């Protein structure tokens, strides 16, 4: 008995079912890819905001000799940058500017401007305050703080106690024989030297000090002896400095 092979094709219903299944699988795949791509863009943006924050206010994780070694643009210039371009180009012939403070990742170009774009290719927002942010591709804003407040970056305090080798403060008679000179960047491209004389108990205070590493000089004027100390000022701090002169002088 001869057997006949069926050459019947697929029915319309079967074709529709196959097409529907393919469509469902394609939708699932696209959604998965879209979700993965979105996560990657968020991660890229978060990393970019952190790099910009470190360029402006320094990286607290960069330490040398047990002390913080990096304070970014603010530490050098003494003020917030007017815009992100000031991180890669001197904003006005500032002698204290030591940039560029940031470089484009992977493929830096001559303009060095890609760092200003988030993971969606949109401009990162910075208006001279204590945060940088991204629109997050229109879904949700992504923000990175430079510090708790602008005050924490620009208005810290340094207190100084001065005694001689015997631990004796200058008193009323000798308080004018010693002076403290504190060199700090003034925010306009130069350096300001703040001069103070101690109280009779040997204390003096400097206010409105920006973050950074600043030079403090203590001068015993009768002999013009000078003691130098590098002062590290972190955000939102009061920095106590104890100075003892080289010998008994009072």
What are these regions (language model features)?
Residues 56-112:
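Short, glycine/small-hydrophobic-rich surface segments
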Residues 2, 6-37, 41, 48:
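N-terminal single-pass transmembrane signal-anchor helix
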Residues 185-204:
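Short, acidic Ser/Thr/Gly-rich low-complexity loop/linker segments typical of extracellular
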């Amino acid at each position: 008995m001869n057997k006949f092979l069926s050459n019947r094709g697929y029915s319309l219903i079967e074709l529709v079912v196959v097409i529907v299944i393919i469509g469902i699988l394609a939708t699932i795949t696209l959604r998965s890819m879209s979700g993965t791509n979105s996560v990657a863009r968020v991660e890229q943006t978060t990393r970019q905001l952190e790099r910009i924050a470190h360029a402006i206010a320094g990286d607290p994780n960069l330490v040398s000799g047990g002390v913080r070694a990096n304070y970014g643009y603010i530490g050098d210039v003494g003020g917030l940058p007017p815009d992100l371009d000031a991180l890669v180009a001197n904003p006005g012939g500032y002698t204290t500017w030591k940039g560029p403070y940031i470089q484009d990742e992977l493929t830096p170009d001559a303009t060095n401007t890609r760092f200003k774009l988030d993971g969606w290719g949109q401009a990162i927002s910075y208006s001279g305050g204590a945060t940088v942010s991204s629109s997050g591709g229109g879904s949700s804003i992504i923000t990175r703080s430079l510090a708790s407040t602008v005050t924490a970056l620009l208005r810290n305090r340094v207190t100084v106690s001065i005694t001689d080798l015997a631990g004796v403060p200058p008193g009323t008679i000798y308080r004018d024989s010693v002076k403290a000179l504190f060199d700090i960047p003034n925010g306009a491209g130069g350096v300001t030297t703040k001069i103070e004389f101690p109280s009779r108990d040997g204390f003096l205070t400097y206010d409105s000090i920006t973050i950074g590493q600043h030079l403090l000089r203590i001068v015993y004027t009768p002999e013009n002896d000078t003691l130098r100390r590098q002062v590290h000022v972190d955000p939102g701090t009061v920095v106590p400095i104890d100075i003892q002169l080289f010998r008994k002088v009072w």
